[in-house]
Design a protein with these regions (language model features):
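Mixed-charge (Asp/Glu-Lys/Arg
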Residues: 1-150
Length: 150
């Protein structure tokens, strides 16, 4: 349930966009976070990265209109390990299936990585999950600025 009807329509509009538009939005998010952007096109599992307080941070945006499944969790875990992240922030369009969570957190070494699984709703409504992620990457505060209207 959305706290504000406007949030629903903003998210709906984003999720109905073409894939290249959603990819550009993910890159805009990374840019707004002052992260080193991932490559255009196939992004090698990273939309942005940086080091903050000596910890390597990985940011990935998957703005799918569907809940992310275990297949996405497999890719995400692999990307976290490949990029040697200490902290990883995933921004999903609508959320995560239980199978995603089971698969991701079923890896015995995953607890060594701080993971923040956010949604567009978390971003727009500045949820508790969003507030917790701010502690690890204060520039997350900038994300909603690219979506605000004057």
């Amino acid at each position: 349930m959305f706290n504000e009807p406007t949030t629903y329509y903003l998210i709906k509009g984003i999720l109905q966009a073409e894939n290249d538009s959603k990819q550009r939005l993910g890159q805009k998010f990374a840019e707004s976070l002052r992260l080193k952007p991932g490559p255009s096109g196939p992004d090698d599992g990273v939309d942005g990265s940086t080091c903050f307080l000596g910890r390597k941070i990985h940011f990935q945006s998957k703005l799918s209109a569907n809940f992310l499944s275990k297949d996405e969790a497999r890719k995400y875990y692999s990307d976290i390990k490949y990029h040697m992240a200490d902290i990883s922030i995933m921004l999903a369009g609508v959320g995560y299936k239980e199978t995603f969570l089971d698969r991701l957190f079923g890896h015995p070494d995953i607890n060594s990585v701080v993971i923040h699984l956010l949604t567009l709703q978390d971003l727009f409504e500045r949820s508790n999950k969003f507030q917790n992620a701010l502690k690890d990457l204060p520039t997350l505060e900038n994300l909603d600025n690219i979506l605000r209207f004057p």
